[in-house]
C-alpha cells in the first residue's frame, strides 16, 4: 500500500509518533474569513483523506486560520474518517485577544478543542512570542493545560532563539512543562 512508504519519528522528546511529513491546514476553511483562496470543506476532505491513505497522521492548524473554520473542518473530517488515537493534531495560539495571557490561553484552548471536536490536543504551539505577557504567566498557563490533560506536548514557532531559550529556562526553573 502507499501508506507503507511513509516514515515516522518521535515528536521532539515525547513518545508521540508522527509522520515525517505534516499536513498544514492553513488553506482549509471558509473563504473570506481570512483569505479568499482557502478550500471549502469538501475539497479539504479530499486532501485530508488522501493524506490519511498515504500514511500521514500529523495535522497542523491554528485558532486563527479562517476564523477557526480550519479547526472545524479538520475535526469533522478526521472524526468521519479515522479514530482519534490514529492521528496527531497540533494547533496554535496567539492571534487572539490578550495573546498569550493566562486568561487567553485558557479561553482559546477550550474553543480550539470544541472546534476540533476532541478533548485533547497532541501538540499546542505558541504562534509567536508575546512581548506584552510575562514569560512566567505564559509558561505556567501552558503547563496547566498539560497537567489537566488538555494538551500532551508544547511547541513554539516564529520567535528569536533567545526568546525560546528564555521560555524553556523559565519552564525548567519552575518545574513546568517545557517545549518538546
Can you annotate each of these PLM segments?
Residues 37-51, 100-116, 164-168:
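Short, acidic/polar
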Residues 10, 18-22, 57-58, 86-92, ...:
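Structural preference for beta-strand elements that scaffold enzyme active sites
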Residues 70-73, 101-104, 134-138:
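Residues at alpha-helix caps and immediate loop-helix transition turns in enzyme cores, especially N-
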Amino acid at each position: 500500500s502507499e501508506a507503507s512508504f511513509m516514515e515516522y519519528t518521535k515528536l521532539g522528546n515525547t513518545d508521540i509518533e508522527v509522520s515525517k511529513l505534516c499536513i498544514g491546514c492553513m488553506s482549509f476553511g471558509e473563504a473570506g474569513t481570512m483569505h479568499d483562496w482557502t478550500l471549502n470543506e469538501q475539497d479539504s476532505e479530499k486532501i485530508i483523506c488522501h493524506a490519511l491513505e498515504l500514511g500521514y497522521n500529523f495535522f497542523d492548524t491554528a485558532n486563527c486560520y479562517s476564523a477557526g473554520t480550519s479547526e472545524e473542518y479538520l475535526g469533522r473530517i478526521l472524526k468521519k474518517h479515522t479514530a482519534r488515537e490514529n492521528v496527531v493534531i497540533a494547533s496554535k495560539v496567539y492571534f487572539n485577544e490578550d495573546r498569550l495571557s493566562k486568561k487567553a490561553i485558557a479561553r482559546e484552548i477550550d474553543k480550539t478543542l470544541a472546534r476540533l471536536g476532541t478533548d485533547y490536543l497532541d501538540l499546542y504551539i505558541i504562534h509567536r512570542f508575546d512581548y506584552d505577557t510575562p514569560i512566567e504567566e505564559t509558561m505556567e498557563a501552558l503547563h496547566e493545560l498539560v497537567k489537566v490533560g488538555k494538551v500532551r506536548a508544547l511547541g513554539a514557532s516564529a520567535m528569536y532563539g533567545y526568546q525560546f531559550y528564555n521560555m524553556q529556562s523559565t519552564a525548567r526553573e519552575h518545574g513546568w512543562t517545557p517545549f518538546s
